[in-house]
Amino acid sequence: MKPPKTIPRREFLKMSIVSGAVLGLGFTYLEGDKIGIVKLPATGSPGTVLNPYILIDSDGKITLFNHRPEMGQGTFQSIPMILAEELAVTLEKVSIVPAPADREKYGSQMVVGSSSIRGQFVPLRKIGAAAREMLIQAAANRWNAEPSACYAEDAVVIHRTSGQKASYGELVADASKLTPPENPALKKPKDFTIIGTASPRRDNGPKVNGQAMFGIDIQVPGMLYASVERSAVFLGKVVSYNAEKTKAVPGVIEVLKTQRNVWGHTREGVAVIATSYWAAEQGRKALKITWDNGDLEQFSSGKIKADYKNAAAADGAVFKEDGNFSNAFDNATIKVEASYETPYQSHACMEPMNAMVSVSDNHCEFWGSTQNPNGVRSQLASQLDIPEENVIVHYTFMGGGLGRRSMTDVAEEAADLSKKMGKPIKVIWSREDDITQGPFRACSLNVCQAGIDSKGNVSAIAHKVICQDIRNQTGDNAEAGSHIAGGIITDYAVPNFRLSGVLQKFYIPITYWRAVYHSTNCFAHESFIDEVARAAKKDPLSLRLSLLKNHRRLTNVLKMVSEKSAWYAPREKNTGKGVAIVERSGSFIAMVVEVARVKESIKVIKITAAVDCGIIVNPDIVIAQTEGSALMGLTAAYKSQISIEAGKVSEKNFDTYKMLMLHESPEIEVTLIKSEDPPEGVGEAGLPTVAPALANAIFELTGKRIRSLPLSLDKV
């Protein structure tokens, strides 16, 4: 999930296009995604693809093509800010529209790993700066002046001494004939006037008044609806079905078997096709299906936990090792050992899964909410055996993605049914489908050990992760990848350290979930660091600072959160505070959770967070993302879980899969660290630290350790 800080194998464009009086700028992607010398269109070698990212027309209209979907993370506001800053225009002058799904032109368009801002920050600045310099050069040529004698402001080029002015619209025809600068001068952060300022999201209004289009809203002429009955036991196979009563339901057109692929496993179902979703659902309820579930009904949460504990005895794959842990642990004066458990979790997106697909002859069209436009396009082309250029993907706003919408399985179902029916088909999952079918966040067992020497110093730490591997669900590899250990701070200055993982293979489907493995591992590691601090008779925050002397950014957020939370002040009666830290998507966060005893239960009073995400494009967006992810972290910490009994998910809807309620939401204070480091991802960083900070706060208040989630605030 974690993308590189720079866009791989991509050259910054130096291309301009002329289409009437239009200046277009973008990047070039070379054939095979190889780095090469960037050519202008007239001299471009075969395989060079030109893609306009911005267009400025003769009316001065500036259009930015956003090649990554908006799913609530705020890119529709932040991305134009980056361009406007370097282009020397006000934010209001930049219109943003979705770019078509086209890997050849736009590279990866997948929205994962909090990658949108950090992946586009420098390229968009370069595009804006290049356009600005070209427009200034065009004006200078017109006035027979040096470019240095001119400057740009609010979409106008001005001559410094004469005061002559020319709007961008007047200059685009001349500017489009110029060669773009190879290294346009970028503003220094101290000179930013747009980046770093708070501005309201431009999609707020349409989302509030109902104008914004989500996948589930899409309608096209001649469309039909589909509701699919799937086995409650994962990997169950359809033996037979009786659709007699289903076909008697008014509006039902057809009943068909279908399937989808989930991380290499085929999931079968029976689809009811109807003229309305209501009719499809009613027809589905009347279906009689015989399933072959094999021996899969033996699985339960209890068995899974037992298997995990047995697996913990294995050494596993070693991902990182410093010093000699075994020797240091054996010779430690104080030994600390603890295990931590986290359950499966559903994404439970506000907008249930859905997809609209129309297949005809050698052509396919998709409409829907997706984090992965390229993946949908590739999937449908492969599935239908048609050229990828014959697949058109229309991606909409998303009612939440959280990793679930990076998958293409729902589109696969819709395409299969559309091909069979010869009509556009919209597949809609019910809330029960969404919660019971997954894929889920992986459950995990974390086994931790630490040694404290005779001087009270932490001399050794070992952390072993036991869980499924998202990328290895078909049994192809015997060992888990190191990514399953994400979220474990390896920067603590402990001389003897070992990080390892043991792969567990189950048929229960898992996938990316907000913050992925950070959401489980951080709970274990930061809870354990707290236990180690208490065993060493040291303050938990102070111990972290002492172990992070050489880590500037983690030290900064810890010091800031200690100040903002009044960490070292005496606690009020019947309250407790806990602290935790994490690095996620390049951002660093320290969090303090404060709890209080209210009658017989515990209440979360306040969350205080300090965030270092590098250069802050829009502080409102960063704060909102931190608040939202913190609340989702609270839900996972003490409200929700997916449990398995007899091979089936026990939770069905929000009556059993509990979500945090508005009245349960605590005060949240977020402080942003001013920085000139490159901007990093913030969509997930606020989630992992909530559970450990909460558990540590409960320990300070009650003296009871929480080592299994979800915890109960009523039974502490």
Task: Identify the role of each PLM range.
Residues 2-26, 35-716:
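Cofactor-binding beta-sheet edge motifs in enzyme active sites
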